[in-house]
Amino acid sequence: MAQPVHSLCSAFGLQCCLLFLLASWGAGATTFQEYQKTGELSTSDHIFPLTPGLVYSIPFDHIVLHSGQRPPELPKSTEIHEQKRHCNTTRHSKPTDKPTGNSKTIDHKSSTDNHEAPPTSEENSSNQGKDPMIRNQRSVDPADSTTTHKESAGKKHITPAPKSKINCRKSTTGKSTVTRKSDKTGRPLEKSMSTLDKTSTSSHKTTTSFHNSGNSQTKQKSTSFPEKITAASKTTYKTTGTPEESEKTEDSRTTVASDKLLTKTTKNIQETISANELTQSLAEPTEHGGRTANENNTPSPAEPTENRERTANENKKTICTKGKNTPVPEKPTENLGNTTLTTETIKAPVKSTENPEKTAAVTKTIKPSVKVTGDKSLTTTSSHLNKTEVTHQVPTGSFTLITSRTKLSSITSEATGNESHPYLNKDGSQKGIHAGQMGENDSFPAWAIVIVVLVAVILLLVFLGLIFLVSYMMRTRRTLTQNTQYNDAEDEGGPNSYPVYLMEQQNLGMGQIPSPR
């Protein structure tokens, strides 16, 4: 009886061991695949360090088609020609109707590549040398985004189609997005904004030099406010990095001129009128003059109607993604003492839908808690300024999106990096590289599954061992009990159970008992 039970237990134990080995092998294969995916993610993160979502690349070469002026120069870096891209980007593109003056704009762009702002070039190079952006334990200089924008400006005659391939060294990813984990940067958004408020006063005059190249109106009070320009770029990055819009529109996506400005356009044509009404329903503080923004109506290139509708929809999307849209007060000195909340002002002229040849400055600003007098302006630069540090303008018909940014320190770039992390984590259904990360967030990681399987197998084996031990002890005890009962019965009823000496004494008399001699 004991041998069949023992053989059954041994066979069951061998089967459990085989199952455990198979589970461990499968978990190891899954871990290896995830490790390869992680390697691909790190490679793509090194290549595209600033892309929170894939967007249309809208170069700013459209600015000066009819004005005959030079576009503003991108910030120069000492490592522009040293850092090489490791990926070949091939875009499947289809030609659309573009004005014939684009070649002229490219010539203007190439002629102004070596033009620098005298007061700010040394500061920019020193800031770029000392404060590179650190994301995912890598040092990434903003020159990569500058070279990316130059390549996109060179391909200006072709509008990118909804598909793009990026052929890297080891893998091919469909979209050039970057996954970042929010626990590596160590600063939430609120801390980074408050730190920006502290550091913006120290670098109060970073971009104060502007060269007028033909229009002296646009130099009105556009100096000594780099902290507001930086705050404006932060707002633009927050509103345009929404992953929900990147799910809905299959756009070809790439980085733009600055490392913190991304412009998202969609193809929803039906929302144009509502976008115009929503933009006009906000505050229009035109009485500020030079206090609020330099609003310039300049002739823009004759774009197709689709571009106009895209930009209108873009303005609506920008408004919808921002949770708090409040108009700018008439005096900038009000409500600046105790708050770090962001306010956005999106201004559109009254005749923006009637005259498509005019453009209006759509301005976004963040008010940090810095004492600002009423005479100073919330500066955004227009297309007539020859030099700011970075100016990105998107003229598409009836609207023009003007955003600016200046680099104060590495804290600003870290704050911008922190803003993109929640969007990346929320994007559960985004295709491409985010699938592996969201798969890990939605389910248990492989090592946890392996540990659970190991613990379950060990507990099962211990339980089976206890059952086997109890059954064996019961059988042994039963055998011992039977042997004991048999021995006792034999001692009591056997022929040698009563002593012979006593029997002889009872049967024989005392005289018959032989006495020992």
From Swiss-Prot:
Subcellular localization: Cell membrane; Cytoplasm
Sections of the chain in a coiled coil: none
Segments crossing the lipid bilayer: 449-469
Free-text tissue specificity from the UniProt record: Detected in lung, esophagus, stomach, rectum, skin, cervix, testis, kidney, uterus and small intestine. Expressed in pancreas (at protein level).
Segments in the Cytoplasmic topological domain: 470-517
Highest classification ranks of the organism: Eukaryota, Metazoa, Chordata, Craniata, Vertebrata
Source species: Homo sapiens (Human)
Domain of life: Eukaryota
Main location: membrane
Extracellular side: 30-448
Biased composition (Basic and acidic residues): 105-116, 180-190, 305-317
Glycosylation (residues): 88, 124, 338
Protein name (Swiss-Prot/TrEMBL): Mucin-like protein 3
Alphabetical UniProt keywords: Cell membrane, Cytoplasm, Glycoprotein, Membrane, Signal, Transmembrane, Transmembrane helix
GO cellular component: cytoplasm; plasma membrane
Signal peptide (residue range): 1-29
Task performed by this protein: May modulate NF-kappaB signaling and play a role in cell growth.
